[in-house]
Structure formats: C-alpha cells, structure tokens
C-alpha cells in the first residue's frame, strides 16, 4: 500500500492498483470461501480440517496497458498530494499484470461467481467534469464485467459476461441463471435490473 501523511499528523493510505488482495465471502451452506489472487485459486473452508481448493491452471495473466498504468499513477499521485503536497511515489510500482480475480460472490444456488480482471477499455471522459475547476481526475480506463462460475464441488461451468453499465456494488443477487444488479444508465442514474443468462 501507499501512504501520505498530513503535516499536522495522521494521513491516508491507498492500495497499490492491481496488487493482489485477499478476498473472502460466505456460502449459504455455512462455510467461508476465500483466496489471495497471486494465482487463480481459492479455498472452500468446508469444516475444520476440510478444505477444497479450486484452481484454474490454464489462466493467462491480463496485462496492464501502459496508458492504463499512467492514468492510475496520475490519479493516485493527485489524491496523495491533496494530503501531502510534497508526496512522491517511492513505494512499489504498479504490477505489469493484473491478478486473476478481484472478488468472489456466492449465489442462492450455492454457485461461486469469480469476478475476473479483464483487459481495460478507455472511455471518453465526461467533458463537464473535466472542465470544472479543481475537479478530481477521472478514471477513463475501465474493465468490462465478467465472471467465471463454479459449482460448489469445484466443477467449472463457464464464463458469464455482463452488459455495459453492470455494477458489482452493491453485490448482485444471484438465483440460478437469474441475476439482479444495479445498472448505471446513460446519465449515470442507478437502477436495479434483472438479467437472465443466455447460454451459447
């Protein structure tokens, strides 16, 4: 993580973009699921002494695009210098590749949905926000939302790609092949939408 301190004491801490962070959630079956995505694996803590590890050995790392890296460095530096105007980036650099996943969700049918890191796409910035004096820099490189889905016994079911605007915050509600999630429309107005998975 990266740190900046106020001259009067105290400070702020930012996670290093794309550095692996531990992820944890709970299954409706009563056990914890978690992992540290330094590789594509996570564990189901079924009972004391019983752990099921799910791993994809065919996973290929997603690279961080040079312009994407530059944007994250610029935004982090801006936020840190709001705390300490003399702040300089002296910690570890942004990794060259992204972790395999960034979050875990469990549906009501007990299936495990792994939120994947994807290649980012650059969106046009909001000109109204960028023209505003003192406006915070915008994140224009964003990743499409995609999940790998597993049965609780570890069987891989496939990848699910979500439509544009799909948000994973708050956590989507998943029941079988139906998903309820917050979607942000053209004016960035949030609303709840229901999706049904289409199988190819």
Task: State the predicted function of each range.
Residues 1-200:
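Eukaryotic scaffold repeat domains enriched in small/polar residues
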């Amino acid at each position: 993580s990266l740190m900046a301190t106020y001259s009067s004491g105290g400070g702020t801490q930012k996670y290093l973009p794309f550095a692996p962070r531990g992820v944890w959630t709970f299954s409706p079956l009563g056990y914890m699921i978690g992992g540290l995505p330094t590789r594509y694996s996570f564990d189901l803590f079924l009972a004391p002494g019983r752990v099921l590890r799910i791993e994809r050995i065919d996973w290929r790392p997603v690279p961080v695009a040079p312009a994407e890296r530059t944007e994250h460095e610029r935004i982090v530096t801006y936020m840190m210098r709001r705390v300490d105007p003399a702040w300089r980036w002296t910690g570890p650099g942004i990794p060259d590749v992204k972790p395999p996943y960034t979050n875990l969700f469990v549906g009501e049918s007990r299936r495990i949905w792994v939120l994947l890191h994807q290649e980012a796409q650059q969106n046009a910035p909001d000109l109204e926000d960028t023209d505003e004096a003192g406006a915070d820099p915008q994140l224009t490189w964003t990743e499409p939302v995609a999940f790998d889905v597993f049965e609780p016994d570890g069987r891989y079911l496939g990848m699910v790609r979500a439509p544009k605007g799909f948000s994973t915050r708050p956590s989507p509600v998943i029941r079988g092949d139906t998903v309820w999630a917050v979607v942000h429309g053209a004016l960035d107005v949030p609303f709840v939408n229901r999706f049904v998975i289409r199988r190819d």
